[in-house]
Amino acid sequence: MVADSVMANMDSLNKLEEIGGKRHKFPAKGGTHQGRWCSGNLKAAVQDSVTANLEKTRQGVRILVVSGERRGESSGRSKYNEIEIHRTNAEKKLKRTVHQWRPVIDYSEKDVWEVLKRHKVNPHPCYRAGWNRCSWAMCIFSTPKLFAGIRELYPEDFEALRNDENVLGFTLDNKCNLDEFVGDTESCVYHGDKEAIRSLITGEFTTDDIYVKGDWLYPAGAFHGAEGGPC
């Protein structure tokens, strides 16, 4: 059912491309979704579309959207409310009540890790492999160190991104191309957790990997700040 909604969005996108073409630019490194269209169109709008169009959520329902933003991540998120009416709320027309709750809004990064530690939850392979942030794989806000990690683990994808710069005639960063941006920066990849790297390369992560069976350890990417992703 969710797949049907996503496919409908893709059909609409194809029609829009026929009318006005594609953007032919990377998202802007800005704070608003108008220029940074990736966050709005590829993340928020997808969830909104599913909620508004899926038969089981379209009308006569009460929905709680739970998300993990923290005020300490950025000045923008510091202004977020813990609980509020979600943008897909449509009580009068469709009797659809949608609230949003951010349960960890006032948590520090250490608070979050302590919750995972208490329940022996295995951190995402990204963190265990050295990434300080589990965001889009090649987020426009990624630092040179993070892009160097992409270049190491996903050389074909990195090359495709370089090629996109040439095809579009625009660079990912507004001051230099990808090669200049990354340069000879050392990769963020931590090679001490082979299983994490295997999961990232293969995309395999099973239910058996959810919990840590031995001692819980902070991942290599912990406590390196929130830089490298949109806020």
Task: Walk through the language-model features, giving the residues of each.
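Nucleotide-activated chemistry modules centered on ATP-dependent adenylation/adenylyltransferase
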Residues: 1-231
